[in-house]
Amino acid sequence: MGLPFLCHTRVCLFSNKIPFVLCGSRFAPATLHAHHTAAGGGETLNFPELSSPSTSKEPSVGSDSPQKKNKKQAFDALARWCGGHQQLLMRIQQSAEDTSAGVVFETPLTEVDSAAIRWLQGSTEQLTCGQSLLVCSFVCEVLYCQLNSASGGIGVEEAQRLQIHALTNRIAALLQRADESNKLESQPLSVLMSCAYVVQRLKYVDNPLFGETQRSLVKVPPSIMFALLHKLRGDGLGKLFQLDERTATDVCLSFLFIATEEHRQAFFSSGDAALVSNVLRRLVRYTASKTRRMRIQKEGDIIDLLTVDSPSDGGARQTPVCTSGTGFTSPSMRECAMIMQNVSFSSPSNRLELLLYLLCVRRNLAQCSLKDIELVPTVLSTVANIRSAEACSIRKKIISQLWLPENNPTLVAQLLVHSGESIPRYVTYLQGVPASKLSPRDAAQVILCAGTYLSYESLQLYIMAALRDIMPSSSLVTLGAETTSASVPATASVPTRVPACDSLETVLSVLLMRVEEKGGSLSEVEKDACMEYIRRLNELIDWCASAPTSSPKPALQRLTLLTKLFNRGLVVHAPETVVELAVQSLQLDPGNTMMNTLKCVSEALPLVSDDKKRSIIIEKMISYSGTRTTSSVIRFLLLLAPLVDADSPHSCELVEQLLKFHTLNPHKLRQASVEGVAKGIDVYTLLLINGIDFLLASGDWRSSPSQLQNVITTWVRDYTLYVMDPARKQKIDDGAAAHVAPATKGEKTDVVQHQQPSRLNEGGELPTLSGPNDEELEQVFTCLLRAGVKLPHAFSSELLSRIRRLQAKRNPADGTDQQVVFPLPAHFVFCCKLDVPVEVSVTPEMMKYHIDACDYRIIHCVITAFFSAAGTFKHNINDLLLCNMRLASRSFELFIQRLGEEASRSFRPATVSSVVANTLRFVVNHITKQERCQRVLRKLNEKGGIEAGEEELEGDRSLIAEHTRLGELLTRMIAYLSGAHVKNVGLSVLDRLSLLSPACGEYLMMRLSTQLSEFTQVELLYLVQKYPKSQDLVAELLGKSDLVSSMDFGDYMRVMRNLPMPINALVIGAHLPGLNFQWCTRILSSLSVRHESVPLHLLASVLRRLNDVTESATLTDRNIAFVVLQKYLQFDQTSGDGGDLEERQRLIKCSCDKLLVLSRINSLDTLKEFLVEFPEALSGVICESLSKHVVQHIVGGLLKDLDGLLTLCRLLHRHKLLTSDVKVAIVDGFFMKTLQSEVEGRANIEGESSQGLQPLNSVRGASLKTTHPVSNVLALALLLSDGPLHFPGASNSSSTICGDNERCAVSSMFQVVKESYTSPRDRLLIANTLVGQKGPNALTVVAKEICTELIENCESVTSNDFSRLLQCISRLKCWSELDLANSRFDEVFQRSCTQADAHSRCVAFRAVSFEADIFRRYESFMIPLLQETVDVMSNEDLETVLSSVLSLPFTEALESLIDAIGTRLLRMIDQCRRSALIRLLQCHAAFGIQDDALVSVCVATLTDQCGRDFRLDTAQVLALLQAAVDLDFFLPPKLVTSCFTWLEHHVENMTITQLGHAVRLAVDVEVGYTAAVHTLTLRALEQRDAIRSNASFREAVEMLCDEFSAEIPWHLRAPVLRRRYQSERLLEYLDKRRLAVDSTVA
């Protein structure tokens, strides 16, 4: 190999330093040796006695020192010694190729060898590390030459053995010397590589003198390998390329030679995996210029050579097409084969470049020896798996340069098979060889390699020669006769069957290849003859008796042959053999053939009929493929997933691996190429389909479907993006256009194409630009429907475009012969799911097409889509029901028709039942889901329904007929259900099925009755819930078992509300004796939903049990029971008449009394404790009992304690327990006795008239103080007056109230209160309190009476109290009822106002301002008083005055008052409240007062306050905006925005009036159509009732719609403006009619 020495001898031997490498052409030292010998004659080599090389580190003086001279002489002698052996080997090899014989070469190097060995023995220990490597290279080269040139003879062989032994020992010593050195990594890369190369090369020498003992001594030490890898990891190779490219090239080749599989596993780390590829890539980059010249070689030369016939002598060597011109004769052909094998895992393009460089640049193939030619097929087999046009071209280029070997048809056939096509001179040679003279083995080899290129007659001759030792001659004659005739003679005996062997398999394989060849030269007659030959030969072979194959590869070949024979219709009955072959084939080294192996074995599965044996093969295939890597999962999905059973032991592991994938896109999974995929199939789609199918068939789908659905959803989301990818579609279009465009540049185009990087397809590269067609996408959609996974909505546009493209493709563009094109079934289903508009109506033809064409597992989805696409939205319920029933009937008919046609081949029994069950569930639920449809069906199902239907439906017989037809079809569909699905359908839709068709429901129940004994008790309860008519059967089955021990009462409670009452009575009666208080409460709660149908005996038994276990109940449990019993009481109050109503109420009240314990409530404190723990929701249950208890035990002790009574009433009122009984007791006991007695006592003390009590209103002066505070008495009286107050109808001695009128009772109570407090201040407090109440009218009457009395005695009222009195009169609006003229009111009014403070004056002013007449009466007096106190008024008083002014007519006095208030506000503008400023602006706007300075200051202050805590109510905001509109002053945008934003946030709480006002202001303020205005607009447009009924609101909304007509959508404006448009049109019509009448009259 071109590695030992540099050609530059001056650098190699005469430099001052030891050379970097003995690398270059292996025969370079021979040239060097020639310089030191005479030209011609023999040569004599003298190896002088040399001293050992010095190892001293002392610097030498001068270049001619003795040490350097000795070193030069020693290495010069070694080089000449090596060159002599190389020259001798060259002559021996040249003489071996020469035809002359008897040439004997004497070896003149014996003495030199002895001297060199002696020198090596004495000098090895003194050599340095680099010197040891260098000398080891020379010695290994000498040993290699001697091993290859060893001659025969007993004496000579013994001498050679001794010499080889001595050289081997020296090499081992030198390697050990270098291995022990610590300077290996510092040695030059070329020196290290040369030593490693020559040592590795000795491993492949085939010589008996060099046995295993010698080979074990001569090995590359690990230290040298690690040093080499260290250099290659760095920049050593790059520097070497910069110094000497030729040497660097040889270093690369040397490394590729020694980088065997053994060395890679032993020395390469994980980071060195790509080191070989990197070195190869660098070598290819350097040699590209040389191989490029070979690529652009004119094709004409090769074509001419391929078409030249072989010469007549058959042995002349052909002229090479191209010569190297470099002089290289290394590496050898064997070394080329080793290099190519070591790079078999690298890039195909780099491997082809290396092959071209080794065989066409480094070697001259025309000068190759026969041994080299015999190795050419081995070299070419390393790239046989590269099936590209470039690879074929390179192989043809190589083979075309070889000369035709003589008398070696086997080698010619091997060369021919690598050419890729028939070479005429090779074929002519093979057809001219006499086949009978060949051995059977050689004949079989020729058939194997060139059988497809030979003529049929020549092939027959080769077959006879190959089979003559296997079959008897009679069988061969018979076989030949049979192949030439069409029939076998009747007298022909049955030939003896022979076991299969390699020759028979070869013959059959070649014949099958000739038959299967497409576009070949064979005629149909020859193909028929070949098939007949195959059939007869197959009959002669006993496949079961075949000898087992020696290795997995022949087993795979035999298995493939059996598969092909079986596919051709031939009988191959050898299942055991097939199993053995499959198992043995799966032991083949995976490499690049794993996919092919799996594919071949999977294709052979039909030959095995036993399911167990098939399962064994499939499990072996999965183990062979692997389950833990991405590539293994991809292989599994492509080939094995359709074959795997759900019970496979590898299923769980594969599912686990699949769940880790977020996509099945091979590119994203970094699967650059996928083998075993036919062209035109989208790999991504195939992976997705098989992956989903595998998950659906796995056991995990039944245990955790949601997890698998999430994974499939993720896959589908990525897949839809892949399908919709516009870049991929563009590439497909561009590629198609480029493929169609013809080449027009001729030879120039060809050159350019050669310069482009090659695109190789090794083992079937993934078609990156392909996408799914409609059929593949249909399969994907089918898988999604089976998995229940939704298609992303974003895919709807792609789906629509595909359907339209399909319709356009099937319909011509000119519009002629238009036909209805239906979308594929799954496409149609997803169109309905995604609301994709499909221009296809639901017709019988369309339904038949989809049900016949769809996958049977999604028929229920297709039928579902029919209902969705039909769009049965009818207003008439009869039409809607008729349409749905017709659609269901037609679907069922087509379904049943397909069941009958394909049940034996397409439908398995379990699958049929599942699909029918899914279909029934959907159709029944869809037809009966609407309540109005259920009402019509009930009418049809009533007794005499046909007659009733005829009367009510007015002759619409079609609905009745369709109902009958659908019932028959449903019955036929139910017949296909299995037992498990009958149970499932019965428990899910039996109730609705009975409603749709009672006869069908009875039939289904009849089928269910046969398996009721297998139902669990819970399932029986669900059944009777769905079908109440089965209650007798269910009760009978339940009665046979012990319900207490066998039925879980909790499960029963979940369904008891919908069970028939007899079933409930049966189950509850069985469990009731052992139930606790909580269970009884739950039973009562569940039964309360159907209280009207609960039997009395069942309710009584449950209540009885509840009373028995009451003692063990907690307070919470009792409260819950109270809640439940309260429901029964409420229901009984609302329910109608019933015979047992009184008994039910009695039982419930008894239970309530049993639950309620009132004995411990004997004081106010205990009552508080009881009510705190008792929920308010139960007040209705205990109200009556508790009230009686409180009256009897608590109220009597509190009649003298006002605070206690007030606390009691407040407590009862808070808990909604202040009943009429308690009120009557307190009024009668406290007000009518205690309080009245105190009044009478005071009257006696004052010495009133003995004729009786005088009215207290006649008392003049102060009275005695009472013992009770007036505020507490008023609070108690008000609590008692809140709500109904009914006194007993008959009077008695202890009560002074007669009658039961509520008004009289309240009035009497407050009369007592009024009589008890006679001072003006107390009376005023009473009046003021009563005015603020919203109680009965009696309170107002008492308040008016008190005001009238105080007005009459107003002289005794203080000024401030007088203002409060005026406020009460104003709030009561009773000015007209007072007799002001007959009293001294005017005098007291003026005096009180004069003496009152500022606040009291404002209160008085507000009181008189509500009555215009009263105000005019005192206007001249009040206004000056207010003006005097403006400066001392508070903010609240100022706002009160301004609010009061708004309701008065405008006068000059009011204007002066407003002006004074404005002047005051200007001085304190920063301290003013926003409400006061708004009131001031509102007053200016109401009365039209123009005060720009004041207004601008107010607006500026309000704008300032917008940014910090801007809080106003809606009325204030509207007032501010309205003031701005009325006064026409400028509102800053910030203030306007804040106001409308406030309105936007509070729009939900605005009244209709406020909303209309805000809408009108949105137009008047001219704020624009902002977001806030948009919110107000939408809110206003939603008020349809107000728009119709409120004229002002409608006018405001219409104004808004006119103003913002461009912004508000028309569909929102139309309802508002429609009335106005209709009115305008009506007026216009009337005007036209009037004009027409006038013109007619005229």
UniProtKB/Swiss-Prot annotation:
Main location per the UniProt record: mitochondrion
**What is the top-level taxon of the source organism?**
Eukaryota
Deletion: any effect? RNAi-mediated knockdown at the procyclic stage causes moderate growth defect and reduces production of guided RNAs (gRNA) due to a block in the processing of gRNA precursors.
A GO term from the CC aspect: mitochondrion
Keyword presence, Ion transport: no
Keywords carried by this UniProt record: Mitochondrion, Transit peptide
Chain segment of the transit peptide: 1-27
Does the record carry Cell membrane as a key word? Answer: no
Location relative to the cell: Mitochondrion
Q: Where is this region: Disordered?
A: 43-69, 745-772
Record field: compositional bias (Polar residues): 49-65
Q: Name one GO biological process term.
A: mitochondrial mRNA modification
Under the subunit heading, UniProt states: Component of the mitochondrial 3' processome (MPsome) complex composed at least of terminal uridylyltransferase KRET1/TUT1, 3'-5' exonuclease DSS1, MPSS1, MPSS2 and MPSS3. Within the complex, interacts with DSS1.
Summarizing the function annotation, the protein's role is: As part of the mitochondrial 3' processome (MPsome), involved in the maturation of guided RNA (gRNA) precursors.
In Swiss-Prot or TrEMBL terms, this protein is called Mitochondrial 3' processome subunit 2
Species of the source: Trypanosoma brucei brucei
